[in-house]
Each structure stands twice: as C-alpha cells, then as structure tokens.
Amino acid sequence: MPQLNPAPWFMIFMFTWAIFLTILPPKVMAHTFPNEPSPQGMTTPKTAPWNWPWH
Amino acid sequence: MTLSLFDQFSSPSFLGIPMILMALALPWLLIPTPTSRWLSNRVVSLQGWFIARFTNQLFLPLNVGGHKWAPLLASLMMFLLTLNMLGLMPYIFTPTTQLSLNLGLAVPLWLATVLIGMRNQPTHALGHFLPEGTPTALIPILIIIETISLFIRPLALGVRLTANLTAGHLLIHLISSAVFVLMPMMPAVAILTAVLLLLLTMLEVAVAMIQAYVFILLLSLYLQENV
C-alpha cells in the first residue's frame, strides 16, 4: 500500500498543519452573523418580496 | 511499469514536485472568505449557515471550557469535508487517503485533549480508566484494557478515515473497470454493474460526509471527557 511508504510523511504532516492553521481559520472566523439568537416561540414575520438583485 | 489498483493512492509528484501540495492548497478557492459586506451572496450565506449550525450542534454537550475549540473543530470539519467530497470526482487526488495526513491530524489533537484533561483535572481524567460499578477482582485487568483503549484512539481515528476513503475509491475503481470490461462481452451485465456503480457512488458521497463528521464528533467526545 503506497500510503505506508514513510518517505513523504513528514512533508505531508507539516504542509497539512500549515494549511489547516493558516488558511482555514480566517475563512471560518470571517463569517459574521448580524442577529442575536432569538428564543423559540416567536411568530415568524411575514416576508415581503424584494425587487433588488441578489448580489 | 504496470499499475496495480493501489497506485492511485501513492502521493503524486510531477517533475520532482509533490502534487499533494496542490491538492491541499487549492480546494480553499471553493470556500470564499466573507468580506465585511452586510449582504453576502448565496455561496457565502450557505456556508456560513452550515458552519454556524454545525458548530452549535457539536458544542451543545460540551462544557464552556471546551468552547474555545470551536474555531479549530469548525475549520477541521470544512477541511475534511471539502477534501473528501472533492476526491470523489474523477482524476482528483484525495489527500485524506494518506495515512500520514489522518494520523498527523488525529494524534496531535487527541494528545491535546488528553493533556488538557491531565493538566486541569487529573483525578477526573484518570477516573475514566475505571468505570463505576466494576467488581473488585476485575479492577487490574480493566485498568489495563482502558489504558489500551485510550492509546488505540488516535490510531483508530486516523485509520478509520484512511480505510473508509481508500476502500471506497478502490471499489469505485474496481466496479468501473468491470463495467468497461463487460461492455463488449455481456452488455446486460455491464448495465447492471453500472447501476451498482451509481449506487456505490451515492454511498461514497454519504461516506465522505459521514466520515468527516465522525472524526470531528469523536474528537469532541474525547474533549468532553477531559474538559
């Protein structure tokens, strides 16, 4: 099984953690949520249609 | 040289450059970083909702001290989920089939949970070695068994992900080869095998998502025991 060849193991280990620690957390943490979590039991407001584009 | 079925898993290199660096660095183009706009687009909104709901669900059973792991486990979920799902497409290398990657993630994270438990609440952490209500005569053997099961955890975590993905890719390879070989000889059997391949591919999509989730879930359980 070629996965058991230990030659690239250290490089893969280092690079995985480098990507996992530098690229991903900024992407995940950049998501912001504008509203506070609301308690359940509130009536859902009726939504009005909007005429401006999605983005 | 003739290729064996396992050669699809050898860490690819081109002109001496290991291609796994590409496989690890490029998928994040599919996860756009949200800007400071109040109104985001569909992709960003969906990813944000997924991350928020997932992290909420995952951290419900954890004490507040463990909540500082939220960014790490959310990032790890996106990491594994993206790599697993992308690898299902033809000719795309799946880095999570590499035992080095999975053990490299599992061992440090498991060790972190164990060290946190041993440092902050050593009595409580060591108490996991002896379940309540054990008959006195069984205590020595049970402590040995619990110790072994503790140390097996990172190995199981890494090997579970590796084996599931490797086996899935191997099966897809085998069955698709069978479809091609059977097509000129027995077209009816080839069509049945193609239906089987379709079902298997749907299973592999599910396995890709579930195995990523199981990895994270087990890490959160190990954290729950220790924090």
Curated annotation (Swiss-Prot), chain A:
GO cellular component, one term: proton-transporting ATP synthase complex
GO annotation terms (biological process): proton motive force-driven ATP synthesis
Coiled coil: none
Statement: the UniProt record of this protein carries the keyword Transmembrane: yes
Keyword Transmembrane: yes
Keywords of this entry: ATP synthesis, CF(0), Hydrogen ion transport, Ion transport, Membrane, Mitochondrion, Transmembrane, Transmembrane helix, Transport
Record-annotated membrane-spanning stretches: 4-24
InterPro entries for the chain: ATP8_metazoa (IPR001421), ATPase_protein_8 (IPR050635)
Record's subcellular location: Mitochondrion membrane
Pfam families reported in the protein's UniProt record: ATP-synt_8 (PF00895)
Single GO MF descriptor: proton transmembrane transporter activity
Membrane topology term: Single-pass membrane protein
Role summary: Subunit 8, of the mitochondrial membrane ATP synthase complex (F(1)F(0) ATP synthase or Complex V) that produces ATP from ADP in the presence of a proton gradient across the membrane which is generated by electron transport complexes of the respiratory chain. ATP synthase complex consist of a soluble F(1) head domain - the catalytic core - and a membrane F(1) domain - the membrane proton channel. These two domains are linked by a central stalk rotating inside the F(1) region and a stationary peripheral stalk.
Family: Belongs to the ATPase protein 8 family.
Protein name: ATP synthase F(0) complex subunit 8
Organism from which the protein derives: Gadus morhua (Atlantic cod)
